[in-house]
Structures are given as C-alpha cells and as structure tokens.
C-alpha cells in the first residue's frame, strides 16, 4: 500500500472468521477513522534528532565516568582501545635474550688482504731485439693470441686516409695481445 505524503485518508474496517475451526459472516463496518500522512522528510528529521540526542548523552556519560570514576574509565578505554606494545622494550629484551644464548663471535683484529693474481703480466724490457714468435710453427707463448699468424701480415696503426683527411683510430685489427716491441 503506497500513500502519498501530506494527504488525508479515511479508513473503515470489517472482519470475517475464516479458519479451520471458526467460520462466519462478515462483521459490520467500523466507524471511519481519519488519518493524515506526514511529509517524506519527517523520518529523516526524527532519525537525525535521535542520533544527536544519543551521541550527546554518550559523550556526557563518558565525561561523567572520567571525572567521577577514573579507574572504571581507564578500564573501559583499555577495553575499547587496547594500547600498543612498546617495541623497543619488547624487542630489546628479545634481542638481549638471543644474544646471551648465541656463542660469541671471533673478532679479527689484524686482517690481511689477499692479493689476487693479475691477469696482465708486465715483462721487463729486453736488451736484445729478437722478434717474439707469432706463428704456430714457432714455439708457443704462455698466452694465446687472437690471430694465428701475423708475421706475413703488414701491421698499420691507421688504415688509409679517408676523404676527410682524418685518421680513423677505431681499427686495431685485434692486436691487443701483441707486445709493444713488434709495433715499432
């Protein structure tokens, strides 16, 4: 049943017994009752007023509890908002307990640095100017060259001059393992 807001209605009722035990005719009509409906916003006003009264009474009750019974107030506050543990105290005690159980660590006072072998070996300048073996037919060196034989290949620091007249220095022809005496 939908009723329009701010309307007046007239109601009359009648009843009839209609069940498994009692059955009967309709009763007479009741006297008319006049009813007027409220506005749509009436319930919003009622709920707002009710919430305002309840919140103010709860606040007043908490203030009275705090002033008159501080022990009960602290107990209620602790039940509603439990306090967080102090992590410095809790974890500090835990770390002290575990440090007491663990064996003491050995301290190194004089630490020696381990010298790693170098991948590059610097040889002293020899007085004789004998060419080093560069071909497989000659005795092998301790290291491996990237190109098998360079004896017959002419070495140049720069390729021929370009049209711009500048020397390109990016061409090293993979001679990074050749001794410097061979370049002269």
From Swiss-Prot:
<comment type="function">
    <text>Truncated form of the receptor for thrombopoietin.</text>
</comment>
<feature type="short sequence motif" description="Box 1 motif">
    <location>
        <begin position="80"/>
        <end position="88"/>
    </location>
</feature>
<protein>
    <recommendedName>
        <fullName>Myeloproliferative leukemia protein</fullName>
    </recommendedName>
</protein>
<dbReference type="GO" id="GO:0038164">
    <property type="term" value="F:thrombopoietin receptor activity"/>
</dbReference>
<dbReference type="InterPro" id="IPR013783">
    <property type="entry name" value="Ig-like_fold"/>
</dbReference>
<feature type="transmembrane region" description="Helical">
    <location>
        <begin position="44"/>
        <end position="64"/>
    </location>
</feature>
<dbReference type="InterPro" id="IPR036116">
    <property type="entry name" value="FN3_sf"/>
</dbReference>
<dbReference type="GO" id="GO:0016020">
    <property type="term" value="C:membrane"/>
</dbReference>
<keyword id="KW-0675">Receptor</keyword>
<feature type="short sequence motif" description="WSXWS motif">
    <location>
        <begin position="26"/>
        <end position="30"/>
    </location>
</feature>
<keyword id="KW-0812">Transmembrane</keyword>
<keyword id="KW-1133">Transmembrane helix</keyword>
<keyword id="KW-0553">Oncogene</keyword>
<keyword id="KW-0472">Membrane</keyword>
<comment type="similarity">
    <text>Belongs to the type I cytokine receptor family. Type 1 subfamily.</text>
</comment>
